[in-house]
Amino acid sequence: MHFTINGRSYEADVDVRTSLLDLCREHLELTGSKKGCDHGQCGACTAMVDGVRINSCLSLAVMHEGDKITTIEGLGTPEKLHPMQAAFVKHDGYQCGYCTPGQICSAVAVLDEIKRGVPSHVQADLTDRPQATNVEMRERMSGNICRCGAYSNIAEAMAEVAGAKA
């Protein structure tokens, strides 16, 4: 199977039952995304497929042949951080760091969702364009769990990147 992950082409011969997360971690040595619960409940495995965030532990790799997949490794480098990565550092949006790759991938995708006008559950009027408010961003990030409780710092990092007030 052919995959494009973080702008790089990969060929992989994996069992059709292999999750996208296991493809990345076990076969391609892209270990940034974490396996927290392996049930889609924690968000530690969040990656983006064609710009849409997914729980990579719940998605079979074979479903994404030919898709453009982005993991935390594809967002920035230690020398040139993605703006969201830099904001997480600035605002201490991490503590133990286990959930951080998934949080950052989700945060990047959340801001893109808002920019594209994708509605959410907290909007009073689904015909209005969503705004990057604290409530809006927190609702959209609710699928990403941080056991250390860095939620306020994560919200501050997202607000900085969005140009909004946390």
PLM regions: where:
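Signature of N-terminal electron-transfer/Fe-S-associated modules in redox systems
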Residues: M1-A166
